[in-house]
């Protein structure tokens, strides 16, 4: 009985058919499946590239800093990156100093460019809705701090702006040098009986009040009720950067400066040769 069953099974055409004929071919892998399968290989290549670049960077930075490579054979990756950042910053400062020594306008151009970039970032952050408020505040604060440091930068050999005294204005043609001082108030009282300063003819005004107020050399002379006179200096007289020389009058009616000079001590100045700041 078992022999008959074995013979029937062996003679069956289905049993004689190979199993590979009934199997379907493999489906092509999708893009996501291909990425998953190739991810370990890509990660291995990426790490190999990073290690190779860090090894070259280590050699370059040790040569640039003139350090013995045998003593720094076991530098960590973070140490290599920190040393590289410091070296690049020093190079940037050296290049900036060299550029400023050859062209002083480089600093102004750098400030203008940084200010323009800062304004563009501020404009973008004010219109972008997806930026976190804390991140926006920190970024703008960092840019403002950098802008303050850039504004404090000076040329090589130039003192700090806060410690630098303003240069004295150039003296007038043929006139003595005077130390700069704050301009006097617009209304300067003069004792009574004072004569108008030389160099200008009186110009009468049309109104009755203008008869009393006359203009001498660009300054309006206004008589006071107590018998004194006052010079009314126009605002345009202080528009220039030249120094203003005060004029004092004595009781004798002659105009004298802070240091009185007798007529015999030097040649008298004519109206054309006298320097007037409002004519610059």
Swiss-Prot record:
Transmembrane segments: none annotated. GO terms for molecular function: DNA-binding transcription repressor activity, RNA polymerase II-specific; E-box binding; N-box binding; protein homodimerization activity; sequence-specific DNA binding. Residues 10-21 have a biased composition (Low complexity). Has a particular type of basic domain (presence of a helix-interrupting proline) that binds to the N-box (CACNAG), rather than the canonical E-box (CANNTG). Keywords: DNA-binding, Nucleus, Repressor, Transcription, Transcription regulation. Residues 110-143 form the Orange domain. Transcriptional repressor of genes that require a bHLH protein for their transcription. May act as a negative regulator of myogenesis by inhibiting the functions of MYOD1 and ASH1. Binds DNA on N-box motifs: 5'-CACNAG-3' with high affinity and on E-box motifs: 5'-CANNTG-3' with low affinity. May play a role in a functional FA core complex response to DNA cross-link damage, being required for the stability and nuclear localization of FA core complex proteins, as well as for FANCD2 monoubiquitination in response to DNA damage. One of its GO terms (cellular component) is nucleus. Residues 1-44, 157-200, 254-280 are annotated as: Disordered. Residues 254-271 have a biased composition (Polar residues). SUPFAM superfamilies: HLH, helix-loop-helix DNA-binding domain, Orange domain-like. This is Transcription factor HES-1. It comes from Bos taurus. Residues 164-174, 181-200 have a biased composition (Pro residues).
